[in-house]
Design a protein with these regions (language model features):
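N-terminal anchoring/stem segment of glycosyltransferases
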Residues: 1-91, 282-325
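Short, flexible, basic/aromatic active-site loop/helix in glycosyltransferases
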Residues: 157-171
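Catalytic core and acceptor-binding pocket of nucleotide-sugar-dependent glycosyltransferases
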Residues: 169-284
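Short glycine/proline-enriched coil/turn segments at helix->beta-strand junctions
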Residues: 53-57, 109-114, 132-135
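A structural signal for isolated positions on well-ordered beta-strands in alpha/beta enzyme cores
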Residues: 57-61, 115, 261
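A conserved donor-nucleotide-binding helix/loop in the catalytic core
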Residues: 38-41, 46, 88-116, 124
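Conserved donor-nucleotide/metal-binding helix-loop-beta segment in metal-dependent transferases, i.e.
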Residues: 123-159
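Short acidic donor-binding/metal-coordinating loop in glycosyltransferase active sites
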Residues: 119
Length: 326
């Protein structure tokens, strides 16, 4: 199965206006030229290598600045195909407000079926064949709760440029969009069309939560409106804005990250995948944890035979003579 990565650099050049819990490190990069932190380079390499090893070819959508940077750090050979034309010509999008729009709009260039793969999503095996028997496949659903989700009343009072979509269900599960299989052309077309309507906000200010509505929220709406059959890699459902509690804390009523529906298939969890996701928030506050994770990514890339992609000088500190040889 073909997958795509998307690296749109426009948000970097608007980083002072970026909003969200995962941008602390990026916003602190002082360079005026495009640059990525080590962890982002490493998980991008690992994500691509793992996909190619287990599942098939991978294509990169980026812009000319992104391509030049990838050439500089020596990772363009990860990709079977690279497209810069689309993102070079992407216009009329605020990359600070809608920083995932580049990846969403790039989808419309692909022929089905294919997988969109966030660069921080690592698949460590062959995706089960029955995952592809449907219109759409996602990593998992999320229970919407907290500041990144909204009520109908919030939309009606805070969003001025467009009415809430007809039949929008604020209580329904939200699909995590870090890993999405598109099995038909209509799934892509309807998703991108709905997304583009929402981001046409002109000069209107929008609250921070709105970007997620234009990304995960609207995909869930499209799935329900068109009754697209949706498979998941796991039956576990992520609870947004949870307490990150451990099982022993249940007696106090603290909430955990993951929950199973009453009827579920635990055998799905034999399939191994990792989404760096929330760890990126922790990285900003715990640099030692970040360095341990970078070392883990580096070691795994090395063990997979990917040493050719680790020559970038910023990554040299993870090389260990005893562990990695000469």
């Amino acid at each position: 199965m073909k997958a795509i990565h998307v690296n749109w650099t426009a948000p970097f050049f608007n980083k002072e206006r970026l909003r969200g819990h995962g941008f602390s490190i990026t916003k602190n990069i002082s360079s005026k030229t495009y640059e990525l932190p080590n962890y982002q380079i490493l998980y991008t390499i690992l994500s691509a290598i793992r996909w190619k090893k287990h599942n098939g070819p991978i294509k990169l959508y980026t812009d000319s600045i992104g391509l030049s940077y990838y050439q500089q750090i020596g990772i363009t050979q990860l990709y079977d195909e690279i497209d810069t034309e689309f993102l070079d010509n992407l216009q009329n999008v605020d990359p600070a407000y809608y920083w995932t729009s580049g990846k969403i709009q790039a989808l419309q260039n692909e022929k089905e079926p294919f997988v969109f793969l966030d660069q921080d999503f690592i698949v460590r095996g062959e995706v089960p064949a029955d995952f592809y028997y449907g219109d759409i496949g996602i990593g998992h659903w999320e229970i919407p709760r907290g500041s990144y989700y909204f009520t109908r009343q919030q939309w009606e009072s805070e969003i001025k440029h467009i009415e809430i979509p007809h039949n929008y269900n604020c209580n329904a599960y939200s699909p995590n969009t870090s890993f999405v299989y598109f099995g038909t052309a209509s799934t892509v077309d309807e998703y991108v069309k709905a997304h583009k309507k929402l981001i046409n906000s002109g000069e209107n200010e929008v609250p921070e939560w709105f970007w997620l509505a234009t990304d995960q929220g609207i995909l869930g709406h499209v799935i329900r409106e068109h009754e697209y059959h949706t498979n998941t890699l796991t039956d576990r459902i992520f609870l947004a804005d949870n307490d990150y509690a451990k099982p022993e804390d249940r007696r106090f009523g603290y909430s955990e990250q993951w929950y199973y529906p009453v009827e579920h298939d635990k055998t799905k969890d034999q399939f191994e995948w990792e989404h760096v996701w929330l760890a990126k928030v922790v990285f900003a506050n715990d640099p030692e944890f970040m360095e341990r994770e970078c070392q883990r990514y580096y070691d795994e890339i090395w063990d997979l035979g990917g040493s050719n992609y680790l020559y970038y000088f910023n990554l040299n500190k993870y090389w260990n003579k005893e562990k990695h040889g000469h």
